[in-house]
């Protein structure tokens, strides 16, 4: 647990979240946050009863983590894994400087599209110039960090939120554009239509500063409902990056989770 957060209000009651994790570094952090959310917002109790306690998902932070997410955008799980395996193995070490210096045609032969090459080289140049610092990013609040990432060429809201949540473990990152979370919220809150990314922002306000934990809960609900009811089996699949993220052990040990 890296810090504490200010008090947060909800329409029903005042919940003291001073001891809640700002970052979800361990399974214990996530469990503490989920229990606080369920207590704070009674609407989440039936969601938790269906989903159960979700497992913390983390992956490597820094340039490698962001590069893996970008490489896997809009691809099947198998294709994304194969391309990332080739890209990461082609450089020793794999870092922003190595990729920045690599020829575009070499990267293309590894399976990266021209758009993804441009995005990754752009990020690498920002890091080399000192205009982007992942250590600083890790300590910014979720909205500020999201803005920093989406100001980079080719980094959209979904990519930024997934990086903040799974690579940095940011407890308040909210993937408003994720289709699975949108569909789960629609079903769980009894909405008539699936909310848009813009509509998801106010829906998540009661869950600040633990929106990242809420996202874990909604993903768990999505998986449970899809398996149990089949009601969302025909919906678009969430980005394949999520499907291959390592799952933290269910132990309540205090050791940090490594991606």
Segments the model singles out, each with a brief description of its role:
Residues 2, 9-62, 223-259:
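Intrinsically disordered, low-complexity, charged terminal extensions of DNA damage-control enzymes
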Residues 31, 61-65, 101, 143-146:
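Alpha-helical scaffolds flanking conserved acidic
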Residues 41, 45, 64, 68, ...:
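Short amphipathic alpha-helical segments
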Residues 59-74:
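Alpha-helical scaffold segments that form or flank carboxylate-/histidine-based iron centers
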Residues 74, 78-87:
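Conserved alpha-helical segments that form or flank metal/cofactor-binding pockets of metalloenzymes
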Residues 87-259:
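Catalytic cores of DNA base-excision repair glycosylases
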């Amino acid at each position: 647990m890296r810090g504490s957060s200010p008090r947060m209000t909800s329409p029903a009651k005042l919940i003291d979240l001073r001891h809640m994790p700002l970052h979800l570094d361990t399974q214990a952090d996530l469990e503490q946050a989920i229990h606080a959310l369920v207590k704070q917002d009674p609407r989440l109790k039936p969601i938790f009863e269906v989903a159960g306690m979700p497992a913390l998902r983390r992956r490597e932070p820094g340039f490698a983590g962001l590069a893996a997410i970008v490489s896997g955008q809009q691809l099947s799980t198998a294709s994304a894994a194969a391309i990332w395996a080739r890209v990461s193995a082609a450089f020793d070490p794999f870092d922003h400087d190595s990729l920045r210096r690599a020829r575009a045609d070499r990267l293309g032969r590894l399976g990266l599209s021209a758009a993804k090459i441009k995005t990754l080289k752009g990020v690498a140049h920002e890091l080399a110039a000192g205009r982007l610092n992942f250590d600083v990013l890790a300590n910014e609040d979720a909205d500020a960090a999201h803005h920093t990432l989406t100001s980079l060429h080719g980094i959209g809201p979904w990519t930024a939120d997934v990086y903040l949540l799974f690579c940095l473990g940011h407890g308040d990152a909210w993937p408003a554009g994720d289709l699975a979370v949108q569909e789960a919220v629609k079903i769980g809150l009894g909405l008539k239509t699936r909310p848009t990314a813009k509509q998801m922002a106010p829906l998540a306000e009661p869950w600040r500063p633990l929106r990242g934990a809420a996202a874990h809960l909604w993903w768990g609900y999505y998986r449970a409902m899809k398996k149990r009811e089949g009601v969302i089996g025909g919906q678009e699949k969430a980005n394949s990056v999520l499907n291959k993220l390592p799952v933290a052990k269910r132990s309540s040990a205090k050791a940090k989770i490594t991606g």
